[in-house]
């Protein structure tokens, strides 16, 4: 009897946060395009570098996510809670779209079901 060795390669997805961050970066730097008279996609602003096959492009601009829009299903951001100290997506400056925000402090009391 003989022996053989096997190697198995596993494909594994990257961490969800990393994938989301990469997509957001691509989205933020996507190139605006339009159709020319021949039906070919051309850049709206030729001052920028032409998009590569790895870049995102768009024809129609994204809706304003700050404002409620029933046709797109966007609820907007008005009335949502934000984090005053965060510079991320949950931060008040970004989430409130420059409209300002109300500050308040709250105390929450919860039963912890602790046993001593």
UniProtKB/Swiss-Prot annotation:
InterPro entries: Wnt, Wnt_C. One of its GO terms (biological process) is canonical Wnt signaling pathway. Palmitoleoylation is required for efficient binding to frizzled receptors. Depalmitoleoylation leads to Wnt signaling pathway inhibition. Disulfide bonds join 82-97. GO terms for molecular function: cytokine activity; frizzled binding. Glycans are attached at residues 69, 83. It is found in: Secreted, Extracellular space, Extracellular matrix; Secreted. The keyword Lipoprotein applies. It holds the Pfam family wnt. It comes from the Eukaryota. GO terms for cellular component: extracellular space. Keywords: Developmental protein, Disulfide bond, Extracellular matrix, Glycoprotein, Lipoprotein, Secreted, Wnt signaling pathway. A lipid is attached at residue 1 (O-palmitoleoyl serine). The keyword Signal does not apply. Belongs to the Wnt family. Ligand for members of the frizzled family of seven transmembrane receptors. Can activate or inhibit canonical Wnt signaling, depending on receptor context. Required during embryogenesis for extension of the primary anterior-posterior axis. This is Protein Wnt-5a. It comes from Anser caerulescens. The gene is WNT5A.
